[in-house]
């Protein structure tokens, strides 16, 4: 298995991504994930990091997006991240009715 993980430099906030290549039964399986995607102040850095990440994204497909909590500096880049790509699953914190 080969894996790479990165904290993207977005300033105050969080944008963390990971990718794994798993060799199984003579095939390579690829897995992409993102944990949070937001920044508080200078969103230009966030937007640059999102576009750079999307250019490198395997098959323009995200396997899973995790959102730790709904503070603005953890979610305000999600719509830009998901624009033009597929995302198989999104995990959000439990929200009481």
Q: Would you name each region that the model predicts?
A:
Residues 1-52, 60:
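Conserved beta-strand hairpin/beta-sheet module of binuclear metal-dependent hydrolase folds
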Residues 44-92:
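Active-site metal-binding motif and surrounding structural segment of the metallo-beta-lactamase
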Residues 95-97:
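Non-catalytic, alpha-helical, charged scaffold/linker segments
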């Amino acid at each position: 298995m080969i894996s790479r993980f990165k904290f993207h430099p977005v300033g105050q906030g969080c944008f963390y991504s990971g990718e794994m290549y798993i060799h199984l039964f003579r095939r390579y399986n690829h897995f992409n994930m993102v944990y949070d995607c937001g920044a508080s102040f200078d969103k230009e850095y966030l937007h640059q990091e999102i576009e750079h990440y999307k250019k490198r994204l395997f098959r323009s497909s995200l396997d899973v997006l995790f959102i730790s909590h709904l503070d603005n500096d953890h979610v305000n880049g999600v719509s830009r991240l998901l624009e033009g790509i597929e995302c198989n699953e999104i995990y959000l914190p439990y929200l009481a009715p």
